[in-house]
Amino acid sequence: MKPFLRHTLDRQLLRLHELDALLSASDVVSDLDRFRALTREHAEASVVAEQYNRLTAREADLASAESMLAEAKNDPDMAEMAEEEINAAKTDIAQLDEALQLMLIPKDPDDRRAAFIEIRAGTGGDESALFAGDLFRLYTRFAERKRWQVEIISESPSELGGYKEVVLRIDGPTDAMGVGVYGKLRFESGGHRVQRVPATETQGRIHTSACTVAVLPEPDETVAIQINPADLRIDTYRASGAGGQHINKTDSAVRITHLPTGIVAECQEGRSQHGNKAQAMKVLTARIHEKERSAQAAKDAAMRKGLIGSGDRSDRIRTYNFPQGRLTDHRINLTLYKLLTIMEGDLDDVVTALQVARGAEQLNELETANNGG
């Protein structure tokens, strides 16, 4: 393990002792929000401390076994036993080292959150809209595999199938590392290019078209309050498309415009105007915050060009080549020849590879910061 990681872990142990003291302080106990935040931090720090203690214990076992081996020159049985313990300890240490590195990667608080996924058809006309429908199915089937909940917020179907635009909300529990839907899918943001022979193509020529995907974290309920109601224009209209006649009899669809930025969000899927307004407000808030995040990411990118990129939807991140059965993620040079399986929702290999690549980036950044730049 690199020295800077061990120093970071030592600081984590000190922080755990601080948290023990803070959580028993009367002023903290009486402040519910602070108490909850510190309790969550304590739980995460405890997991790290437990793993670190296991690591140091196995390192001690390794040192002891190596001493035993050095002293067992004339005792083959003892030497064999020592070698077995050395091999077992080294295996455990490598696994614990890797797990601790993942735990030390700085956490984005938004990774725990639900996500809005916006899929928009781009260049390629009808074929692009059909591919937007394919991406919609990919993400919904991936969500089904994870037992996540999927909700359509708004949709604009195309005439030949697929979507001109569709917005989903996906929610589900966090994993053991505290990563939720947004943390899993955040790296899907960007330009997705498809190469295939359209069903309407009689000459068998391969066409290229594209869609854009934006993945936004659902904002905290308290954040939405910070938007000035005077800055909003709220319009109601009759829903079209999905929803049926029952919705079309009333002006239940809602469109909200944030006047200072011109950002618009709408929802027409619910049966009540109140419910649609609440969902549209969540999407609007997420888009406003994403604009702020993108501006900050652009500033950061000017100083450091990350491998994964800023998540800007103009970045071409991936190519889906159907004739070759190939998916290529250009950010990390990942190529998989199981495109049809992936399009049925088997996205885990892609998601994991992107998370590992980003984790390696963050560890390098952490090391640079610890070394004083």
Swiss-Prot record:
Keywords: Cytoplasm, Methylation, Protein biosynthesis. It holds the Pfam family PCRF. The modification N5-methylglutamine is found at residue 245. It is found in: Cytoplasm. InterPro entries: PCRF (IPR005139), Pep_chain_release_fac_I (IPR000352), Pep_chain_release_fac_I_sf (IPR045853), Prokaryotic/Mito_RF (IPR050057), RF-1 (IPR004373). GO terms for cellular component: cytoplasm. The keyword Lipid metabolism does not apply. One of its GO terms (molecular function) is translation release factor activity, codon specific. Methylated by PrmC. Methylation increases the termination efficiency of RF1. PROSITE patterns: RF_PROK_I. Its main location: cytoplasm. Belongs to the prokaryotic/mitochondrial release factor family. NCBIfam families: prfA, PRK00591.1. HAMAP family: Rel_fac_1. Peptide chain release factor 1 directs the termination of translation in response to the peptide chain termination codons UAG and UAA. PANTHER family: LD18447P. This is Peptide chain release factor 1. It comes from Polaromonas naphthalenivorans (strain CJ2). The lineage of its organism: Bacteria, Pseudomonadati, Pseudomonadota, Betaproteobacteria, Burkholderiales.
